[in-house]
Design a protein with these regions (language model features):
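Conserved ATP-binding/catalytic core of the eukaryotic-like protein kinase fold
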Residues: 1-184
């Protein structure tokens, strides 16, 4: 969390690569994440406000601060009915569909990446953490992102069979749809 002072005052989330973690691979994934988020304009996806680099050259992005709890925790704690839970789930599906229409696969849909926050007392789910997102076609950044052969990318319990194969081949929008099914 950070305090933005210009051009307006507001609390924001600031994502910055930690010192010593700025390998080429980490920087490339970071830039892909901020590019993926910058392409989105959906009420159920956390918004990016600004991107840049510090004076020392460390890349960062400033985004909407989403305060809330995991979607599963929200549903349990508030004892939502099935129709109420499905209403939240439908909003998440629309957000993922928006990402797909923008050419982005999230690849890590899971409860901790869907935060429910309250807006005027109304629950609003927000899809967050596009850190391992992948472009459907082409690249999200000019920097090359290397995924090592048989490198594990994602959360096993929510992975599609294609994603779990570790080849990276065959991963497309169905990967996110599979994860949504597991979440449901």
């Amino acid at each position: 969390m950070a305090e933005q002072k210009e051009p307006v005052k507001r609390r924001v989330a600031l994502k910055l690569i930690k010192l010593g973690m700025d390998t080429r691979q980490v920087v490339a994934r970071f830039e892909a994440e901020r590019q993926a988020l910058a392409m989105m304009d959906h009420p159920n996806i956390a918004k990016v406000f600004d991107v840049g680099a510090t004076e020392a050259g460390r890349p960062y992005f400033v985004m909407e601060l989403v305060r809330g709890v995991r979607i599963t925790q929200y549903c349990e704690e508030n004892e939502l009915t099935v129709p109420e839970s499905l209403n939240l789930f439908t909003l998440v599906c629309r957000a993922v569909q928006h990402a797909h229409q923008k050419g982005v696969i999230h690849r890590d849909i899971k409860p901790s990446n869907i935060v429910v926050t309250l807006h005027d007392g109304v629950p609003v789910p927000k899809v967050i953490d596009f850190g391992i997102a992948k472009a459907i076609e082409g690249d999200l950044t000019e920097q090359t992102i290397y995924t090592q052969y048989q490198q594990f990318i994602g959360t096993p319990a929510y992975m599609s069979p294609e994603q779990a194969e570790l080849s990276g081949l065959g991963v497309d929008t169905r990967t996110d749809i599979y994860a949504l099914g597991v979440l449901l």
